[in-house]
């Protein structure tokens, strides 16, 4: 009886240690990514702060233009952020939003759609369309403050991506 109990004890101990190691590895990888993003923010803080409003405006304009088609050119988000003149981008956004302000619910919704479009850009077209439909439904279920918070977080992460 003692041998099986001892064997069971060692099996459980081994499994426990293995689970702890796997948990530590997962935490380490996540912490490493977070540390890298923090380093990027600190190293490029000024650039990051300047890039955030550009990314936000680009996201809003991108989705607004898809829906309202004020500019006949189908711009890529990457081009809006990195190559389009910032004054022109702001003018295009104002034209697209019309009577809606940049702080409006409409603008925030466009911003979220633009941000998620970029996050899902790597997916095949059909899958991307399906996911964007889910995003639209999720946006409708969020409160105004939750949408603003989500948009801010998304734009911050996008800006980090452009710094990499």
Show where each model-derived region lies.
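Bacterial N-terminal signal peptides
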Residues: 7-15
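Mitochondrial intermembrane space
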Residues: 20-164
């Amino acid at each position: 009886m003692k041998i099986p109990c001892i064997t069971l004890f060692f099996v459980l101990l081994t499994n426990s240690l293995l689970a702890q190691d796997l948990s530590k590895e997962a935490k380490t990888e996540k912490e490493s990514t977070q540390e890298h993003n923090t380093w990027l923010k600190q190293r490029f803080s000024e650039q990051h702060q300047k890039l955030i409003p550009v990314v936000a405006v680009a996201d809003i304009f991108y989705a607004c233009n898809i829906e309202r088609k004020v500019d006949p050119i189908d711009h890529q988000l990457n081009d809006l952020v990195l190559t389009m003149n910032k004054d022109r981008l702001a003018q295009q956004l104002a034209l697209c939003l019309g009577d809606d302000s940049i702080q409006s619910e409409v603008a925030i919704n466009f911003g979220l759609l633009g941000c998620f479009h970029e996050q899902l850009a790597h997916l095949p077209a059909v899958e991307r369309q399906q996911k964007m439909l889910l995003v639209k439904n999720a946006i409708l279920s969020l409160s105004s403050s939750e949408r603003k918070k989500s948009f801010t977080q998304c734009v911050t992460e996008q800006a980090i991506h452009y710094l990499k």
